[in-house]
């Protein structure tokens, strides 16, 4: 029997129109995103307080942005961005059709114009300092594939360790985490859960070993800050237990 009777028959189609047609570094670009089935815009569910998340990175994974396209009256989504430098960028569009599966769709954009000097090769980076906050991945030496993997962060300000209660909710959680594999740009969208030991704590399942870039966004005093890390995930022993969700949304 057909297992898919209750699901959307096809994967929805995602299209992006850019205005101006040529995307140029340092200039405002506008994107109109549609998610359609049979040429009709389909309704999306609110996930983590938003109907659509757009995560943008450059190919070197040194630049990151996370924005939320606004729904238009016709059911399309509109957003603007300014890219810092010429080159290739990846756009991860994260959405969930009502009654459908959470989906991450990847698009690339070639940005023309001024090329900023290239970034140095990625080195591991396990502590991030931003606006006087020191964010540390506490269990950085214990990241493995093939198991439920916790991510434990401490946050300090002027030598004082912050607690979970010091974090303001951002997108319905204590923080928002994205991990992208450097080699094949595999994308993990991770939403923290509560854990009294850490101001930011999450669990995920990492399928591929290797070097990852990680961005942790947290909100304090009404301002969202982004801490970035470069971490190594090693191969864990294969077990029988494998999660049923491989959509990249954890």
Residue spans for each PLM region:
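Aromatic sugar-binding surface patches on proteins
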Residues: 63, 72-78, 196-201
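Beta-strand-rich extracellular modules
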Residues: 84, 94-98, 217-221
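Beta-strand-rich structural segments
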Residues: 27-40, 93, 134-136, 148-162
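Extracellular Ig-like/FN3 beta-sandwich strand-entry sites
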Residues: 28, 86-88, 148, 209-211
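Short flexible loop/turn segments that cap and initiate beta-strands
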Residues: 39-53, 161-175
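Residue-level recognition of secondary-structure-to-loop junctions
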Residues: 71, 77-85, 206-207
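Extracytoplasmic/periplasmic copper-protein system
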Residues: 1-21, 98-154, 165-168, 173, ...
């Amino acid at each position: 029997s057909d297992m898919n009777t209750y699901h959307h028959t096809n994967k929805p189609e995602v299209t992006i129109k850019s205005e101006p047609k040529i995307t140029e570094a340092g200039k405002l670009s506008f994107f109109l995103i549609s998610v359609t089935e049979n040429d009709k815009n389909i309704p999306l569910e609110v996930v983590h307080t938003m109907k659509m998340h757009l995560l943008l990175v450059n190919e070197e994974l040194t630049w990151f942005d996370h924005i939320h396209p606004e729904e238009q009256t016709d059911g399309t989504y509109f957003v603007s961005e300014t890219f810092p430098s010429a080159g290739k960028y990846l756009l991860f569009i994260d959405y969930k059709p009502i009654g459908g599966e959470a989906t991450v769709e990847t698009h690339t954009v070639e940005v023309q114009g001024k090329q900023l000097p290239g970034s140095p090769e990625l080195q591991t980076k396990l502590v991030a300092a931003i606006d006087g906050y020191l964010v540390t991945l506490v269990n950085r030496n214990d990241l493995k594939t093939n198991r439920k993997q916790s991510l434990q962060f401490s946050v300090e300000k002027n030598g004082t360790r912050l607690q979970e209660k010091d974090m303001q909710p951002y997108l319905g959680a204590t923080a928002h985490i994205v991990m992208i594999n450097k080699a094949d740009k595999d994308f993990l969208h991770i939403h923290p859960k509560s854990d009294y030991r850490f101001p930011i704590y999450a669990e995920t399942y990492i399928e591929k070993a290797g070097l990852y870039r990680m961005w942790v966004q947290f909100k304090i005093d009404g301002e969202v800050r982004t801490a970035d890390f470069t971490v190594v995930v090693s191969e864990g022993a294969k077990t029988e237990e494998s999660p049923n969700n491989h959509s990249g949304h954890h």
